[in-house]
Design a protein with these regions (language model features):
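N-terminal, polar/charged subdomain of small-to-medium soluble alpha/beta proteins
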Residues: 1-116
Length: 116
């Protein structure tokens, strides 16, 4: 898995990067059986005009492209990152369920054709 953590318009923080990698472990566990290549981009970006912190997470695999971003005033990057990870995990779970359901549907259709 190729993981890139970017800090836009701010200094790099080793503590924040370590926390982000710990939070991404949930995503890594979910993607461990997926086909490669898998690209993960995590972007931290503060707002210059307001006290908003924006975090964006992009995951690109051979099966799907997913983007999750969150921006909220008055909260720290850690809270925003937790929210983005949770939303992305739900998106991945839903996409995987769709793929499994479609395979089951195709298998049932094949069985139906054989029995006719």
């Amino acid at each position: 898995m190729n993981t890139r953590i970017t800090f836009r318009n701010m200094d790099k923080s080793d503590v924040m990067e370590t926390y982000a990698r710990q939070q991404l472990e949930k995503i890594y566990e979910f993607l461990k059986n997926e086909r490669t290549p898998i690209h993960i981009d995590l972007i931290f970006e503060p707002s210059k005009l307001r006290e908003h912190h924006r975090v964006e997470l992009r995951i690109k695999t051979p099966n799907y492209d997913l983007i999750s971003n969150y921006e909220y005033p008055g909260t720290g990057f850690y809270d925003v990152l937790d929210r983005v990870i949770d939303v992305m995990y739900k998106q991945l779970r839903d996409e995987k369920k769709k793929r499994v359901d479609s395979r089951k549907h195709l298998a049932r259709a094949d069985d139906f054709k054989k029995n006719r």
